[in-house]
């Protein structure tokens, strides 16, 4: 069976995912993309990914699955229409879901259309553990994001920090996951994913650190409850095309697509 998969956005993550799908002969796919600029299409995907004109064009193409990888604004513009039309979605820009009103609208749209929303793990691990303790009022979750200067180069000047002279680590934010995800939409999707899987946007605590000595994009997750403790530390290689995100993210999205299409899954 050939699956029809449409992307919203065709940046670094979506391009890597599309290439992975096209290379998988065991799971043939037809691909299309809704993108603002046809020049975004990498040469390796030219002629292999159909370009769609707006949401009407996407709906007319009738995909089996829609993968959003274009940022939080794209979710506000397109997700509700896709879900109402009955199209299952994978949402990569999880930070948008920190907005309770938007999240409620998307869930209502999915219910109306009989669609499902999936959020990939992305750059992190341990979501199954967080889901297991989600209902406990006595659970504590702390997440630390520690990334090198390259991941924050565009934002640091606006915070009064010179990225070229920064020699020591600096804490950029300390507070609840909701505020972190909405304040830093290009860097903190992970915070929203953790909070949605676990104890919520308010109780999940987030520390954001820029560190010129960081070995890649580092993620530390600590969970404590009477059920036990979990500590996870990941050191992910940055994406060659976008240092704000981990190279692992595209593979996580690809794995989520394969689970969505599979008859047999684990986890």
UniProtKB/Swiss-Prot annotation:
Enzyme class: oxidoreductase
UniProt cross-references to SUPFAM superfamilies, sorted A to Z: Glyceraldehyde-3-phosphate dehydrogenase-like, C-terminal domain, NAD(P)-binding Rossmann-fold domains
Pfam families: Asp_DH_C (PF01958), NAD_binding_3 (PF03447)
InterPro entries named among the record's database cross-references: Asp/hSer_DH_NAD-bd, Asp_DH, Asp_DH_prok, L-Asp_DH, NAD(P)-bd_dom_sf
Signal peptide annotation: none
Gene3D superfamilies: Dihydrodipicolinate Reductase, domain 2, NAD(P)-binding Rossmann-like Domain
Keyword list, A-Z: NAD, NADP, Oxidoreductase, Pyridine nucleotide biosynthesis
Oxidoreductase in keyword set: yes
Alphabetized GO MF terms: aspartate dehydrogenase activity; NAD binding; NADP binding; oxidoreductase activity, acting on the CH-NH2 group of donors, NAD or NADP as acceptor
Pathway where it operates: Cofactor biosynthesis; NAD(+) biosynthesis; iminoaspartate from L-aspartate (dehydrogenase route): step 1/1
Single GO BP term: NAD biosynthetic process
Substrates-to-products reaction catalysed: L-aspartate + NADP(+) + H2O = oxaloacetate + NH4(+) + NADPH + H(+); L-aspartate + NAD(+) + H2O = oxaloacetate + NH4(+) + NADH + H(+)
Keyword NADP applies: yes
EC numbers for this chain: 1.4.1.21
Annotated residues for binding of NAD(+): 123, 189
Chain segments annotated as coiled-coil in the UniProt record: none
Active-site residues from the entry: 219
Function: Specifically catalyzes the NAD or NADP-dependent dehydrogenation of L-aspartate to iminoaspartate.
Similarity section: Belongs to the L-aspartate dehydrogenase family.
Additional remarks: The iminoaspartate product is unstable in aqueous solution and can decompose to oxaloacetate and ammonia.
Name assigned to this protein: L-aspartate dehydrogenase 2
Record lineage: Bacteria, Pseudomonadati, Pseudomonadota, Betaproteobacteria, Burkholderiales
Gene responsible for this protein: nadX2
């Amino acid at each position: 069976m050939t699956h029809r998969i449409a992307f919203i956005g065709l940046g670094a993550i979506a391009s890597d995912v599309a290439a992975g799908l096209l290379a998988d002969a065991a799971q043939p796919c037809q691909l299309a993309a809704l993108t603002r600029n046809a020049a975004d299409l990498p040469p390796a995907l030219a002629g292999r990914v159909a370009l769609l004109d707006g949401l009407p064009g996407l709906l007319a193409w009738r995909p089996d699955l829609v993968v959003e990888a274009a940022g939080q604004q794209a979710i506000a513009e397109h997700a509700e229409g896709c879900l109402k039309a009955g199209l299952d979605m994978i949402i990569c820009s999880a930070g948008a879901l920190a907005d309770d009103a938007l999240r409620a609208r998307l869930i209502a749209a999915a219910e109306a259309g009989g669609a499902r929303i999936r959020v990939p793990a992305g750059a992190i691990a341990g979501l199954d553990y967080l889901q297991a303790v989600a209902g406990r009022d006595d659970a504590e979750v702390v997440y630390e994001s520690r990334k090198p200067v390259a991941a924050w180069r565009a934002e640091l000047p606006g915070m009064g920090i010179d990225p070229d002279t920064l020699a020591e680590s600096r804490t950029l934010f300390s507070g609840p996951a909701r505020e972190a995800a909405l304040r830093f939409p290009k860097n903190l999707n992970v915070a929203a994913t953790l909070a949605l899987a676990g104890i919520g946007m308010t109780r999940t605590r987030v520390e954001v650190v820029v560190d010129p000595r960081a070995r890649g994009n580092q993620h530390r997750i600590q969970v404590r409850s009477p059920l036990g403790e979990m500590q996870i530390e990941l050191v992910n290689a940055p994406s060659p095309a976008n240092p704000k995100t981990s190279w692992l993210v595209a593979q996580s999205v690809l794995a989520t697509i394969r689970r969505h299409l599979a008859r047999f899954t684990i986890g």
